[in-house]
Amino acid sequence: MSEANVNKKEKGARKVRTGYVVSDKMQKTIVVELEDRKSHAKYGKTIRTNSKVKAHDEKEIAGIGDLVRIEETRPLSKDKHFRLVEIVEKAK
């Protein structure tokens, strides 16, 4: 094992999600709407559920309507458990 790997702690399996920014009015925080699609066990119909999560945006670069990728992280506040990884597509 190399010394570089000994000193570096491994991040556990973190959830990476993609969603649209619906609010950027808070300082260094964005609200991202995530869509989850599941097939009903008995009837097979696709069911869509939406959830909104707060994510940390250190540089405040994301705007409303942007498609962003967020990653799970340690709790940053009461409601914030995600951080912005990248902006996949800017809003038009």
UniProtKB/Swiss-Prot annotation:
Per the UniProt entry, what are the Gene Ontology biological process annotations, in alphabetical order?
translation
This entry's Gene Ontology molecular function terms read: rRNA binding; structural constituent of ribosome
Disulfide-bonded cysteine pairs: these are: none
Keyword terms of this UniProt record: Ribonucleoprotein, Ribosomal protein, RNA-binding, rRNA-binding
**Which PROSITE patterns does the record match to this protein?**
RIBOSOMAL_S17
Q: Name one GO cellular component term.
A: cytosolic small ribosomal subunit
- Record's Pfam families? Ribosomal_S17
Q: Coiled-coil stretches, from where to where?
A: none
As for family, the record states: Belongs to the universal ribosomal protein uS17 family.
Subunit structure, as described in the record: Part of the 30S ribosomal subunit.
- Which function does this protein serve? One of the primary rRNA binding proteins, it binds specifically to the 5'-end of 16S ribosomal RNA.
**Protein name (Swiss-Prot/TrEMBL):** Small ribosomal subunit protein uS17
- The gene it comes from is rpsQ
